[in-house]
Every structure is written in structure tokens, then in C-alpha cells.
Amino acid sequence: MNRRGILKSVLSAAAAALGVNRLAAPAQAQVAPTKHIRLYVEMDVPAAREREMLQIFHGTFVPEAVKHEGYIRVKMLKRRTILQGTAPAQHNYRFELEFESEELRQKWIASAEHQRVWPQVERAMTTLKDYPVVLYDEV
């Protein structure tokens, strides 16, 4: 068989496979998407400690967090401006963590690894107790 014949056969097979998959998809049971949780921590980090906190976050915390079951993402956000309403002036960073479920997040925070890495981030904050930590469910 020549190259043209092989190419036609491959394309025909691919087209048939795509057609079969499109027809079969509606018959398959639809799986409900997982509803994740998201945790927000409002942080007050003095300007003199920002670089240190960000180095710890990106260099220590993130590489450890990604290893844990249920982890989806973690972000550190620096507040630019308040567009509407009010917010505590000292809260200049927001830590954002997303996990597949609260149960898996609880496993992560109970781990020795979390006990080692979170206090390093936390130490850069001015407020070490009673800072806002808010948990949301995806709906």
C-alpha cells in the first residue's frame, strides 16, 4: 500500500472513531462534577517581611502542598485596591487554597508537612492569632 492509501486509511479510521464516540457519549452515564472547597486567609504582612514571606510561600509551602491528595491549587494574592465597601487596611495579602474536599484538606493540615511549612508563612504576619480564615463550598 502506498503512503496515500495509508493516509486515507488512518483518516477514515480516525473519522469513524470520532463518529462512534460522539454517538456513544449521550448513552454514557453523566458523572456529576466534584464540588471543591476553597479557603481564604486574610493576612497582614509588613512591607519589610513581604519578600521573606513570598520566598517561603513559593519555595517551601507550595512544593509541599502540591504533593497531597485532593490538592487543586494555592495562590497568594496581594491587594491592589478596594473598589467598593471597606476592608481592614492592614490586610494586604490573601492566601487562597483549593482542595477537592474539606476532608482531604483536614488530612493535609493534620500532616507533619503542613505543621512544618504553614508556621513559616504565618510568622511573617503581624497578626498571629484570630486572623480571618474563611472556608467556602463550591455551589
Question: Where is each model-derived feature located?
Answer:
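Cleaved targeting-peptide boundary
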Residues: 30-35
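N-terminal export signals
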Residues: 5-26
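Active-site-flanking beta-strand signature of metal-NTP-handling nucleotidyl enzymes
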Residues: 36-44, 95
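Short, glycine- and small/hydrophobic-rich beta-strand elements in well-ordered beta-sheets
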Residues: 29, 64-94, 135-136
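Short amphipathic alpha-helical segments
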Residues: 49-76, 113-122
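Short amphipathic alpha-helices within nucleic acid-binding modules
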Residues: 51, 102-110
